[in-house]
Amino acid sequence: MMTTDKERIDSKFDSRYRNLLSMETLSEIKEESINKELSLGKSFQEKLFLQKRIQLPKPNINTTSSNTNSFIEKNISISPELYHKCKEAIFTLEQLNDIINHFNSDNLNSKYIGFVGIRKLLLREENPPINIIFENELLHGIIEGLNMSVEFQYEALWCLINISFGKNKESEKIIKEGGYEKILNLLNHNLDEIKEMALWCIDNFVHESLKTKKLLANKSLFNKLITLLATTSNEKIISHCVCIIRVLIKHFPNKKYEKIDIKKLINLISKLIIFIDYYSVNESEKNILYDCCFILSYISENIKQYKDILLENGVIQHIIKLIKTPNIEKDEYLFYILLNIIGNIINGNVNQTNQILNYGIIDILKKNITTKNKKLQKEICWIISNISADIPKNKKLLIDIGLFPILCDIYNKSERSIRIEVIYALCNLTQVNDKYYLDYIINNGILNIICSGIKSNETKEIVVCLEALIYLLHYGKKTSKDGTNFIGNEIEKMGMLDVLENLQYNKSEIIYEYTYEIIKKFFPYE
């Protein structure tokens, strides 16, 4: 059975989607995107582009969407007769010399024929003949079309969209030729169709290289995008704006976010998240939701002074409501980003953590902590570790709901990256000088896990567990009634003294210092 264009595209991008989900952490996704933009936004951008091509009317693949042209047509400077003639015309590569002659003509009517011819040659192929642009030195003339009347701007933008979608740093060539500044100015155009295409060009630019990302990540572009988001209801414009912001926000020079209105951006992105009904969205709206959540994830992690805005504008309540929606966890990428936003807020101050806990997040964590998706499981364990590092009341919430026995089981079955988050969550319980919590540690197998962590080969895990052990030994000494440290006795029974003595020869200075302190203070007779 033959595979259709749509099926082939869906298969290609479903595969990339699965590859993205297999990545370990959001930080890994961010790091990977520096060299090769593998984020979902990139995948959806490429998919949208290819779908745009296959949706062109057939068999006459040279025609253009009548809806778009109806707006353009009202503002053209050439004759309507020529406009419609070019609209229906078919151009082939065999006509290239004639097309170039028209394109280079000083006569506007002839030049327009050339523009349309080039655009249709680039658009009609799945792998467009971009090389003809550079072999025939046409790029400068195409860019100059951005300064002309709207029908030329439309054709020029379509050409640049196709050129910048190439694989050989074509975007850098367009920028070097002065095209970016002209495209940026078109974001002020009175026609949404022109603004949309200008954004599409910029969207292509920001997905090309790290050099291009850094070049475009500036207040001029950001402020224009923020203004567009604040003034439009056009779904395509919104989609491009949030995709560009998602890609560029992490490349803003020296992280000087005070040069852009971050508060306004947060509120606009939050409104979009709240407005979009996840269970009745089309694919474009879902992509917008993904990008918006990714933006808030980045902001909540890296621009921490704005966390309170997220709590005040209602988006966090909406996110938690969305997380609680039945079967939302099946959309693993979205579920992960939503949890990451919540985790970033919990990682803030006590008031911020308490607000999140008041919304019932702990029940969600318990429900999903045994997920088979290791990336999600690690994120959940990280969130729990932040809660367990908080005030005693919040530690007790985790105890009361029964999360710690589950964490102990996860530690014994999981890989290194998850174990360290579990260790943090368990060891944070020791940092309270309260008999209730410390007795809980002793009576529920957590001390055994801490000792297992000390025996591991991971420096970070050993250090965290040694710190916890010091807290416990101090507690045992303080509560001793006959001079016997019952924590010390338990450790001896587990055969940990030899382990501690051997760790004094560890290459890590801090491990040596901790083990030396433990033996000197609590086992001086050894």
Model-predicted segments: where are they?
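Intrinsically disordered, low-complexity regulatory regions
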Residues: 1-98, 112, 116-121, 483, ...
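Buried hydrophobic core positions in alpha-solenoid tandem helical repeats
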Residues: 98-100, 141-143, 182-184, 224-226, ...
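Alpha-helical solenoid repeats of the armadillo/HEAT superfamily
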Residues: 106-119, 148-164, 190-207, 218, ...
